[in-house]
Amino acid sequence: MSAQQPLVSAPEPARARRHFLQAGPALAAAALVTATPAVRAATPSDAWCATWGTAPAGPPASASTMSFANQTLRLIVHASIGGSQVRVRFSNEMGSTPLRIGAAHIGLRSSGASLVGGSGRDLTFGGRPGATIPAGAPLLSDPVELAVSALSDLAISVWLPDSVQATTLHDMAQQTSYVSSTGNYAATPALPTQRTISCWPFLAEVDVLAASGSAPARTVIALGDSITDGARSSGNANRRWPDWLARRLQQEGQPGCGPVGVVNRGICGNCLLTDYSNALIAGHDCLERFDRDVLATTGAGWLFALIGINDIVYSPSSSPIPAEELIAGYLQLIARAQLRGLRAIGATLTPFEGQAYYTPAREAVRQRVNDWIRTGGAWNAVVDFDWVLRDPAQPTRLLPAYDSGDHLHPTDAGYQAMAQAVPLNLFTAI
């Protein structure tokens, strides 16, 4: 980070006013999500916790090109924390017809579409090798023994024996995954690849049984739009701001705290209040998807919300959405999170002057919203991403070193700076 943007490692009073605001007493401990029957009995210090997750949305405009017929998908994901057992949550939540899974498998990824030798494990569903997911539903696999290391790549393979379209997927994965030639290759160490894809079809979450030590494992859920989704970050490198945060949590840790997973529920084009985008790929608004994408996350401990820019820029330029409507939406997120025992962390909206849709009226809404986020006292904590990314000489613009070129999305360095500004003592035991 530049000298003008010092890191904040703790919410000390002199610096907290610029980067971080703490409000209210600590909340009661969040209840653990009940695990499915384990391969071995979990010890009292173990807890199921999400290590990776994404936000499923609807099909892209080119859905007809994203189809599979008797093929195996090998989907690559990056674990934030480790554990001794693993289970996978698949999703047909945007589908209108049942989805049949013929076989599923998980292993440690070595490189490309290949697995580390001996790491492959078959996934079962109620003891059966396959399952059918009803339209609109998720599907959780049985747990399986697999030693997963933090910050390692996993390969989830799923054989789809029927001809299906990717009606439920996360479109902007920033990660290459693989589609096989015809047949069931779920357990094959080296997948015979027909083509690559850069999305995650029918996949929502990976959980691990984490050894928690002095405190149970918990997960941070990053809820947001394309800035959380990592737009314009380097592909196949895990350089979204939640990825950088996961690295910090592993490298720097936090005394007295159990493992902290990080799950990215950002969707490019997403809004807080309304499905403004015509494309289903932008997902349902945050208020609508909150229960599925936040509260249903295994081991949810913290909501980290950076959302609202698209509500502002998609509204009519002559009369932008009132700041009060966004504030009312934030209050709903906060109330619903706290009701379930989560701590609610809010982030200020980042600069976007230079974008074609920038107007002074829209900027005024952003400033009003940010003033409330900083000073309203409703969040348990606030991280000032606006302060971190803005150009001190032109505060309505991104700092050039953090501007990816579209004047909205950060560079890799910008995403890293965002994560560096998050005080890790936010994630103490709850």
Model features per residue range: what roles?
Residues 271, 278-279, 283, 313, ...:
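Catalytic His-Asp segment of secreted/periplasmic serine-dependent ester chemistry enzymes
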